[in-house]
A protein has these predicted regions:
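Short acidic low-complexity segments
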Residues: 48-60
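Conserved acidic residues
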Residues: 28, 62, 142
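Beta-strand-loop-alpha-helix segment that lines the small-molecule cofactor/substrate pocket
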Residues: 63-70, 74-121
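C-terminal helix-rich "cap/oligomerization" subdomain common to oxidoreductases
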Residues: 63-66, 289-338
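Contiguous beta-strand/loop segments that form the cofactor/metal-binding neighborhood of enzyme cores
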Residues: 166-251, 276, 280-299, 334-338
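A short glycine-threonine-serine/GTX helix/turn-capping micro-motif
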Residues: 157-161, 273-281
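Predominantly a Rossmann-like dinucleotide-binding segment in NAD(P)-dependent oxidoreductases
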Residues: 113, 120-194, 198-200, 247, ...
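N-terminal Rossmann-like dinucleotide-binding module
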Residues: 1-45
Length: 338
């Protein structure tokens, strides 16, 4: 299969590297209008075809990965799907739910693969955490807290929610096996840019009685990548900044015991376990799954419907930040998150 990578900046260049190692990929085509990005790739991957325009190779390629700025995702994906190409789009899949729905319909109508680059859904730790939740090892899930913070990198065309929150929304949807029924959000810009650089989102998963809180920031002194899951039996913390023991399971909890109008609490302080989880490179899993899906015709692990589910939350968060109101959503069917 001949696969193009459109947009060869920091992340697109990584796709070129991974695709160059996949046995099912006979040709990697690197596409970027900026020649200064193309030249280093030409030297590093001499077997790759490096060009500055999609027009030069659209008839040559069988599939493409789009790693350009978010607002260009939908027009590029639509053009490729209309040309009969399989497509994977980096996060966020599109800049609106209307665009996302159009791409999903276009792929379905033409029997083409549409995948979304939610890398963490291919992460071994996140998969392990999902399996623990699904298996009931944490008990009933009360809430999930996530923090994705750093000093930068400010983006030129989207705010911090559209830049960082797709990771956390996709993780939470995957771990809970559900999508939100309501979204509220607050954000602000502190550095004189037109886009919010700090934001807080609250997601209500009303169909399972859980909530999630997301904190994203480009304006924080420390780099934080953390997911906390609190259940009735145990609690789990996934800290992606740790070199070892990224997932820790805490045998801790509380239990109320009403007596004479008071509620004395019983606290449980158990041990901490960090399970051994064999790690693979998530991006390699992303690209391998996309290529294999395009060849076989099977549904990709993270398809367009899952990308649409994330965009719906992002758009609801934008509406909530603008209006100050909670936005109601219809949860996705089980088939979307299977």
């Amino acid at each position: 299969m001949k696969v193009g990578v459109i947009g060869c900046g920091y992340w697109g260049a990584k796709h070129v590297r991974v695709l160059s190692s996949l046995p099912d990929v006979s040709l990697v085509v690197a596409i970027d209008a900026q020649s200064e990005r193309i030249e280093p790739l030409r030297r590093m991957y001499p077997s790759a075809l490096c060009v500055t325009s999609l027009d030069e190779v659209i008839d040559l390629i069988d599939a493409a990965i789009i790693a350009t700025p978010p607002r260009s995702h939908a027009p590029l994906a639509k053009r490729l799907l209309q040309a009969g190409k399989h497509v994977m789009v980096e996060k966020p899949m599109t800049a609106s739910t209307a665009e996302a729905r159009e791409l999903v319909a276009l792929a379905d109508d033409n029997g083409l693969t549409l995948a979304t680059g939610h890398t963490f859904e291919h992460n071994a730790v996140v998969k392990h955490l999902r399996d623990m939740v699904t298996g009931g090892e944490l008990g009933k899930i009360y809430y999930i807290d996530t923090a994705r913070l750093n000093l930068g990198l400010y983006q030129p065309d989207v705010n911090v929610v559209w830049d960082l929150a797709p990771h956390d929304i996709s993780i939470i949807n995957m771990v809970l096996g559900s999508t939100p029924t309501a979204v509220s959000a607050w954000g602000a810009s502190h550095a004189g840019t037109p886009f919010e650089d700090v934001a807080y989102l609250r997601l209500e998963y009303g169909n399972i009685g859980a909530t999630a809180n997301i904190h994203v920031s480009w304006l924080d002194p420390s780099k934080v990548r953390r997911v906390t899951v609190v259940g009735s039996q145990r609690m789990a913390v996934y800290d992606d900044m740790l070199d070892e023991g990224r997932l820790r399971i805490y045998d801790k909890g509380v239990q109320g015991a009403p007596l004479d109008g008071t509620v004395p609490m019983s606290y449980r302080y158990g041990g901490i376990v960090s399970p051994h989880i064999p790690m693979t490179e998530p991006l390699a899993e992303v690209d391998r799954d996309f290529v294999e899906s395009a060849i076989s015709g099977r549904r990709p692990a993270v398809d367009g419907q899952r990308g649409l589910a994330v965009v719906e939350v992002l758009e609801a968060a934008a509406e909530s930040m603008a209006t100050g109101r909670t936005v109601q959503l219809t949860p996705a069917t089980d088939a979307v998150l299977a």
